[in-house]
């Protein structure tokens, strides 16, 4: 029996806890989520050096598992209903239950966002021609959070001068190739599928093969997305025009070649992209533009994280299905949009400390470091998840360098967070703590409350289940005396084990 359930020997004045109930309308599946008003800083357009920055909007299917934490529901079978199931992870990440999406794993998830003055947000906008989204004069602004204190340039950014050591990424060809029984695309011969792709932050390029295979990276699609993100995020409108011009731009040529199965045309457009980006790197344009940025567009954050996941976790995702039902070691993921929403609500910024208790494969820990630039900690005890988390961290470090972005410091700890000295020390400095306690036992939740006694005043604790229970005697409920709770709702497609909306809490240490 938990010590908190025993009858008290002392008479203590009863304290009435106050619970804030945030009433939010039930989201409609077809409407986009509009970023809440409690965003940490101003939510603006793409962080660019140019006064009229470019941005990218890509239509995407329902979100796939893209952020992690140890938890959710019970029952070994996967249901197509919206009832919770323990894990919806096959070889590649799929959409939550209830979604009909079966798109390529390279496709990232939609993020909650704030609308700019030029974007009314009606459903009709989704039908706008894709050219409008690439035209610098009509380009829409993508939500991100600007942090005036953040410096985004990676300390090892290659700016066209001298040599550099290889970043050590997992190349796309290592997970999707002819050797993996994939087939050539765009009428290319087997000896013609090899290509290289340049990134804005490095001299070295990534190796791809233009092939297709079930549950494999779509090399051509991945390349096209990189080209769009580089042009729309790292360049001024004038610099981006050769890439995004809707008639003769490189992106248009790539898309046309892919649609017409013109492999040679695709390779020619890719070669021109590589050459033009190299010229911009050499003349210092990339470094100059990154220096003017104060935030990373959420779509780019999601894409980078998906690149990391698809090259490290996805090929071994079956390892995550080995969990012990009915214990604290059940695996499930909070998705990118949910995590961004949490960061907004808790006002997480680059000078803060974030801790994820039960961090799974490290998705949330990495997202906090990349999206907000903060010091980010995660602790996990499941061996398979820990091994994949280490692989993700290594690839994440290399990928951020390729993209020229400096993330916050990442710390991943193995073991029980109740006993990890480094994790407990980090908790004492933490500003935001995430606990995906959807399937935690009552004993573990009670132990967590005891740990929360050491949190600093004002620390935000985000959990899927409250630590304050109405059925407990108030005078014996430690949680009610130290936590002020706000009950909230998360939207559809925010977690991996169900496509339905649900509830969560943000508790403030008082």
From Swiss-Prot:
PROSITE patterns: DOT1. Residues 65-88, 96-114 have a biased composition (Low complexity). The keyword Nucleus applies. This is Histone-lysine N-methyltransferase, H3 lysine-79 specific. GO terms for cellular component: chromosome, telomeric region; nucleosome; nucleus. Residues 206-510 form the DOT1 domain. Pfam families: DOT1 (PF08123). The keyword Repeat applies. Gene3D superfamilies: 1.10.260.170, Vaccinia Virus protein VP39. GO terms for molecular function: histone binding; histone H3K79 trimethyltransferase activity. Keywords: Chromatin regulator, Methyltransferase, Nucleus, Repeat, S-adenosyl-L-methionine, Transcription, Transcription regulation, Transferase. Ubiquitination of histone H2B to form H2BK123ub1 is required for efficient DOT1 methyltransferase activity on histone H3. It catalyses: L-lysyl(79)-[histone H3] + 3 S-adenosyl-L-methionine = N(6),N(6),N(6)-trimethyl-L-lysyl(79)-[histone H3] + 3 S-adenosyl-L-homocysteine + 3 H(+). In contrast to other lysine histone methyltransferases, it does not contain a SET domain, suggesting the existence of another mechanism for methylation of lysine residues of histones. GO terms for biological process: DNA damage checkpoint signaling; DNA repair; methylation; subtelomeric heterochromatin formation. Coiled coil: none annotated. Belongs to the class I-like SAM-binding methyltransferase superfamily. DOT1 family. Histone methyltransferase that specifically trimethylates histone H3 to form H3K79me3. This methylation is required for telomere silencing and for the pachytene checkpoint during the meiotic cell cycle by allowing the recruitment of RAD9 to double strand breaks. Nucleosomes are preferred as substrate compared to free histone. Residues 37-57 have a biased composition (Polar residues).
């Amino acid at each position: 029996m938990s010590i908190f359930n025993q009858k008290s020997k002392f008479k203590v004045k009863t304290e009435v806890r106050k619970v804030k109930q945030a009433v939010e309308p039930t989201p409609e599946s077809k409407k986009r989520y509009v970023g809440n008003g409690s965003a940490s800083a101003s939510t603006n357009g793409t962080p660019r050096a140019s006064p009229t920055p470019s941005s990218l909007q890509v239509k995407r299917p329902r979100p796939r598992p893209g952020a992690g934490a140890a938890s959710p529901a019970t029952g070994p079978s996967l249901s197509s209903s919206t009832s919770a199931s323990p894990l919806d992870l096959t070889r590649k990440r799929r959409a939550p239950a209830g979604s009909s999406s079966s798109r390529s794993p390279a496709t990232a998830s939609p993020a909650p966002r704030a609308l700019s003055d030029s974007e009314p947000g009606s459903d009709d906008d989704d039908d706008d021609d894709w050219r409008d989204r690439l035209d610098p004069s009509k380009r829409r602004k993508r939500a991100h959070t600007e942090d005036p204190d953040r410096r985004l340039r990676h300390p090892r950014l290659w700016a066209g001068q001298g040599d550099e050591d290889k970043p050590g990424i997992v190349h796309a060809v290592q997970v999707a190739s002819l050797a993996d029984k994939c087939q050539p695309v765009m009428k290319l011969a087997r000896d013609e599928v090899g290509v290289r792709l340049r990134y804005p932050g490095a001299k070295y390029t990534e190796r791809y093969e233009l092939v297709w295979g079930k549950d494999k990276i779509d090399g051509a699609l991945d390349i096209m997305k990189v080209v769009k993100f580089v042009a729309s995020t790292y360049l001024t409108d004038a610099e981006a025009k050769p890439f995004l011009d809707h008639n003769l731009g490189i992106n248009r040529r790539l898309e046309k070649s892919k649609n017409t199965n013109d492999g040679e045309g695709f390779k020619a457009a890719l070669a021109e992209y590589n050459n033009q980006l190299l010229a911009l790197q050499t003349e210092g344009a990339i470094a100059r533009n990154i220096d003017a940025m104060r935030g990373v567009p959420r779509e780019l954050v999601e894409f980078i994280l998906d690149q990391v996941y698809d090259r490290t976790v996805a090929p071994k995702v079956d390892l995550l299905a080995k969990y012990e039902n009915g214990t604290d070691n059940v695996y499930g993921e909070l998705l990118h949009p949910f995590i961004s929403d949490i960061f907004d609500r808790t006002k997480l910024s680059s000078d803060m400390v974030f801790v994820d208790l039960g961090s799974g494969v490290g998705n949330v820990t990495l997202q906090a470091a990349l999206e907000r630039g903060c010091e980010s900690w995660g602790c996990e005890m499941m061996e398979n998840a820990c091994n994949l988390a280490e692989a993700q961290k290594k690839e994440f470090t290399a990928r951020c360098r390729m993209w020229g972005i400096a993330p916050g410091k990442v710390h991943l700890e193995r073991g029980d967070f109740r006993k990890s000295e480094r994790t407990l020390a980090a908790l004492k400095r933490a500003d935001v703590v995430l606990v995906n306690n959807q399937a935690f036992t009552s004993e573990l939740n009670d132990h967590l409350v005891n740990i929360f006694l050491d949190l600093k005043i004002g620390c935000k604790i985000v959990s899927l289940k409250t630590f304050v229970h109405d059925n407990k005697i108030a005078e014996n409920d430690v949680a009610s005396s130290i936590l002020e709770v706000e009950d909230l709702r998360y939207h559809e497609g925010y977690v991996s084990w169900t496509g339905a909306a649900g509830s969560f809490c943000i508790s403030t240490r008082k």
